[in-house]
Amino acid sequence: MRFVLFATLLFCYACAPVTDNAHPPSARLIPLAQDAFSGSSVNVLSGVKQTLYTRNGLQYAAFYNANAKLVVAKRAVNSDQWQVVETSFSGNVNDAHNHISLVVDDEDYLHIAWDHHNTPLKYARSVAPGSLQLTKARMLSQPGAEAAALENSVTYPQFYALANGDLLFAYRDGGSGRGNLVLNRYNGKSKQWQRLHNSLIDGEGQRSAYWDMAVDANGVLHLAWIWRETPDVATNHDLSYAQSTDNGATWQRLNGQPYTLPITLATGEVVKAVPQQHKLMNPPVVTADAQSRPFIASYWADTPTDIPRYHVVFSDDTQGKGSPDWHEMKAPKVAENFALSGHGTKRPPISRAVLLVESTRNARQVHLIYRDDYQHGNVIALSSPLKKPAWHTQVLLDQALGAWEPSLDIAAWHNEQQAHLLLQAVAQNDGNDHQSLATAPSHIGVLVWQP
């Protein structure tokens, strides 16, 4: 494979609502490949955990190429040269749900799941530490018993690395409007998976939770979700939250009150009530600051006919009561109104966002990274201090990216305070998961930004 090296790119553009040219951010583009599939957004969906992951000085990546083959790659973090392997595995790239998720365990084995939308589990591991050669593996099921192991109807697989070297694997069992959140744990010593929860969040056959989970720097797990009543995105409602301080075994509300599992619509802690028909996008994104205080973000409209905006809901003890409560920051409204309804993968004019929280001795800063069609389809960073909100917008990449959405290398952020984002210009059929668009393969790479 031929590689082209790009020089470091520096961007600073004046954009509404406020600009700050005194200390512009820098963005660096590291090219990976030239033949990534671009007819859907399957390679670059927001919130995937994760398509990029850094461990022990190596960054791993995965994508589908123009032939729908699963490709894995790695590079040393001090080099822009990638080792790239096209595997024998493939995926249904017409459907953007069928994203790739990977992680590297404590012994440097690569774990990967791919090609899921209400379909049987596909999971593989590397044959040796640091290797890109994969072998298909099983988690919990025996041949012919996938349904009994809740591995027959998998969607949204996500991997998480725990501080003790173990892994978590989360996914939805069942379809939209009738799905449950399943959680597995990988024991790094025995190299075996076990089931933690058959149903951590239960839709009771009437709805499903669209969730995001994060492991913070202190090892606390944060789980945020919205409910959807039917496959129609317009039935999304309410932001809810749970946390775990024992690697996912038990869960509690922000105030420490334990949950009785599974969590349901009636028992979940609602941190922000958002009615149906308010253009609430799923899933939310959750993260935490250095003191494990949770932050949750998504976009929605304040009324059914209003223009959507990003909202950040966060916990803080602003009243000095000794216990935190929930607060909300509202970003500026986007440039124009739009509708959000219907089935399938949507193609709205703004993407879902990555949420970053910088914690310093004296202040906290919030960053939202997203794509905005109203700003020429560019990659945007929207930033504000937490104490006295004042939003600043900066363009990180002056390039139209189609339906691109950001997902984060969480290890690079925790270790280096750098946002590493898989970057590719892609197309997406609105509401159509059966047919991709006839677009040529496109370049794929990594955008690196340090606030």
Outline where the language-model segments fall.
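Non-catalytic N-terminal targeting/anchoring module and adjacent flexible stem/linker
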Residues: M1, P17-A22
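Extracellular, repeat-based ectodomains that mediate carbohydrate processing or recognition
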Residues: N21-P451
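C-terminal motif of bacterial Sec signal peptides marking the signal peptidase cleavage site
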Residues: C12-A14
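Sec-dependent signal peptide recognition
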Residues: M1-A7
